[in-house]
Amino acid sequence: MYSSRRTAHRPAAARAVPSVLLALAACSASTGGPSAGSPVPVSTVAVPFADYHQHLMSPGLVELWSDPVLPTVELPEALDRVLRTRERVAGTSAGGEIYTEDAQVVELSPWVANWIRGRSAVEDLVSRVRPGARFVPNGYGIEGSSAWIATTVFRGDGPSARAVANFLFVLRRTADGTWRIAAESASLKPPSITAPVIAEQLVARLDEAGIRQAVVLSGAYGFASDSSAGPDEHARVRAENDWTAAQVASYPERLVGFCGVNPIRDYAVAELERCASALHLRGLKLHLGNSGVDVRNPAHVEQLRHVFRTANRLRLPITIHLRTPDPTYGREHSLIFLEQILPEAPDVPVQVAHLAGTSPGYSSDEAMAPLAEAVAAGDPRTRSLYFDLAGNVTPTISAETAQLIARRIRQVGTERILFGSDLDPASSPRREWGTFRGMIPLTDTEFRTIADNRLPYLPPGRFRTGSPPR
């Protein structure tokens, strides 16, 4: 599942532009792919047998992960005028009029820092931003000749309006009394989930795509992160796994449920055993980033080894979000996983989510590389290692990134690549598969192999699905 802050990839023609702004720009330039470099109509492509990376959303998780927009505030007229001008100049060459000569735009995240400095460079950026965004202020301050405005960016009107980003503007009053933008920073908002998503809704989305089965990954670990933990943590983790088990049980031939735990909690093994025996969940989902795991900490590694051994003993396949909170996450972290943790589960499929990174986009190739190299070298520790690419392929990835993903797929072999779409209210399994087919330069045979991959833990059955798209 998406992290609380995510970065999007940018077209090759604009590598110097902050990715968060280009995600809003929706530039029309080709970004690569098998032909035109855009998502192909789903009606023309093969249909995956299964979606190996899906989530439901319980009422408890909605409350935990919802990101409500702050109340709107009324700005002084002079500051409001700056925002309205900023809206108006998007997509035009007139943007420079509202910026200072030394203006800069910065995007900061745990993993990247991109800067643009100078009025002309910022003006060029603004000229390529898709118009139509609305900046809704939710805070401001003025001190002498300096001011700041915090805003939420919306696209769409009425019921379809959606918050897509948060912007912070820093303003400076010039000698003639005019307020100009001296700096602005932005962060993409994850898709807003405001209502539960239940099994019936997921099955309908699978039917729309003609996908027969899905693996539902419990988000119970969300209640055990450092930011959400409380005295009732264990009870909430149990309740979430209970809820997931009850949901997937209503579609036993279509849905497979995986238990969710924080692997470094002292109750992790007991909860995993309960999930297998009492709830009949068929696998384990681990999210190292959400769970605060540090694979450079020997105590954390030992606990992960214990959890992997337990899953192997219970014959529970594992899906692991390998990226940790460490901002230096990369090759060293993957090698620790490969050498010290993975060998503890030699008899079950182990699925590395998001090509060893996060989503959206593909930004962790340094972590993916040693795993792909080990597979290509025939390392026996990787005998049951698989990879999903949930959220890695977006309509805005560069041609260079698309080629890199294709190279990694071929390096590990298409038989190890699993389709997954994650839970994104703004997308669907149907759309995600079409985007993957349209953006990544693989052959039809390679796409067919990925679509047909079926891991042994999926239940047998006669499937009643909607007809695959024609």
Report each predicted region and the residues it spans.
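Catalytic pocket-lining loop regions of alpha/beta-barrel enzymes
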Residues: 282-283, 296-418
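Mid-to-C-terminal alpha-helical segments outside catalytic/metal-binding sites
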Residues: 26-31, 39-48, 64, 93-94, ...
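Bacterial N-terminal signal peptides
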Residues: 15-26
